[in-house]
């Protein structure tokens, strides 16, 4: 299975870089993983709705340019479907079973994802109604993908 994570912005915090590197290493026996970072737009604090939309649209164009046509696209979105870890494992397993071996997860920037990116998504996934920093979300997503593979293989880890 090939999994790509397309994420807006660069990770600056060392502890996040180390956590991400650890899960990428742990995932290597299960899938080929790639993390693609696209530049975030410079956005001052008090943006008007029109300015915010421009920022999200520009980031969205960068995201869409990184998605391969054959990939099944999963956008992380507050309005997406909530899945338990077991349901997420089943979801990944089913995609692989039915020949969808390329998955692309999309993590937007601090202002979210553009309408165009959400329309391109084949599935919208939510990690709950809480808001997380998009940099931290990358680590959380990788941990859940790792957990899913452990569940799929019946290997110890998941409690």
UniProtKB/Swiss-Prot annotation:
UniProt GO molecular function: rRNA (pseudouridine-N3-)-methyltransferase activity
GO CC annotation: cytoplasm
Gene3D superfamilies: 3.40.1280.10
Subcellular localization, as worded in the UniProt entry: Cytoplasm
Binding site for S-adenosyl-L-methionine: 76, 108, 127-132
Keywords, in A-Z order: Cytoplasm, Methyltransferase, rRNA processing, S-adenosyl-L-methionine, Transferase
E.C. number(s) listed in UniProt: 2.1.1.177
Reaction catalysed by this enzyme: pseudouridine(1915) in 23S rRNA + S-adenosyl-L-methionine = N(3)-methylpseudouridine(1915) in 23S rRNA + S-adenosyl-L-homocysteine + H(+)
Top-tier EC class: transferase
Classification via Pfam families: SPOUT_MTase (PF02590)
Subunit structure: Homodimer.
Function: Specifically methylates the pseudouridine at position 1915 (m3Psi1915) in 23S rRNA.
Family note: Belongs to the RNA methyltransferase RlmH family.
This protein's name: Ribosomal RNA large subunit methyltransferase H
């Amino acid at each position: 299975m090939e999994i790509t994570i397309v994420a807006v912005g660069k990770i600056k915090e060392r502890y996040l870089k180390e956590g991400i590197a650890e899960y990428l290493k742990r995932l290597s026996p299960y899938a080929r993983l790639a993390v693609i970072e696209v530049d975030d737009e410079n956005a001052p604090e008090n943006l008007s709705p029109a300015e915010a939309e421009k920022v999200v649209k520009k980031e969205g164009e960068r995201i869409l340019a990184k998605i391969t046509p054959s990939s099944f696209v999963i956008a992380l979105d507050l309005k997406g479907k909530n899945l338990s870890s077991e349901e997420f494992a089943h979801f990944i397993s089913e995609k692989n079973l039915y020949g969808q071996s390329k998955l692309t997860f999309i993590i937007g920037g601090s202002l979210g994802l553009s309408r165009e990116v959400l329309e391109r998504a084949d599935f919208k996934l939510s990690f709950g109604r809480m808001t997380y920093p998009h940099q931290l979300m990358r680590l959380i997503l990788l941990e859940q993908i790792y957990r899913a593979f452990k569940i799929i293989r019946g290997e110890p880890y998941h409690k």
